[in-house]
């Protein structure tokens, strides 16, 4: 597996509340994670850092999980535990009241990839030169779009587009979505925060992923492109290809 992680403050925000990275368990099986924190007084970066650290630390203690079913079970259970830890910590610190974070994570299982998500950080797959979104946003705007109350055009500039219906650290229990999809040689997996998807149209995202650039260059182009369109939020990108091997590395 070859992975490239990038995170950038953007052009407007004073702090980067995104977090993520690539981490391996005892059998060198990787997990890739992106989290986008929220909350005032830098509480957002505490929440996203906790989510990534707690999930990756738990993963580092495991041995290889070989089936998609095993991985789904582990992700659901562990993310639930991570959520409880963030809630308890927020309750113990007055300055952190109201903090939370999105989370999207992926683990490879033989010829498949298992993805888990909470919030509006997304997972995409480029397969057969077509980019498709794997995850569903847990947001007010997505719900309005799903029920036909607003159009896609309305959604792009909706005044309440940042309101999440699910996030880690908000309530004692959280619903975690999981997806299992084929992941083949030459496919590219993209995990990202909304600082990318709110700035760069999916048609351009697809063109970048289909280009002849290296994976590292593609990651850099995503950050540059999002900033060129305004960089209104923190931008985080994690790209994964199956056909190369690279030792996992932490990043934040």
UniProtKB/Swiss-Prot annotation:
Protein name (database record): Serine/threonine phosphatase stp
Organism: Listeria monocytogenes serovar 1/2a (strain ATCC BAA-679 / EGD-e)
Single annotated GO MF: metal ion binding
Reaction equation(s) it catalyzes: O-phospho-L-seryl-[protein] + H2O = L-seryl-[protein] + phosphate; O-phospho-L-threonyl-[protein] + H2O = L-threonyl-[protein] + phosphate
Record keywords: Cytoplasm, Hydrolase, Manganese, Membrane, Metal-binding, Protein phosphatase
Domain of life of the organism encoding this protein: Bacteria
Gene symbol of the encoding locus: stp
Note accompanying the cofactor annotation: Binds 2 manganese ions per subunit.
Family: Belongs to the PP2C family.
Main location group: cytoplasm
EC numbers, comma separated: 3.1.3.16
SMART domains the UniProt entry points to: PP2C_SIG (SM00331), PP2Cc (SM00332)
Residues reported in the UniProt entry to bind Mn(2+) 2: 36, 194, 233
Purpose: Protein phosphatase that dephosphorylates EF-Tu.
PROSITE patterns hit by this protein: PPM_2 (PS51746)
Mutant lacking the gene: phenotype: The stp-disrupted strain is 4 times less virulent than the wild strain, demonstrating that stp is required for full virulence of L.monocytogenes in BALB/c mice.
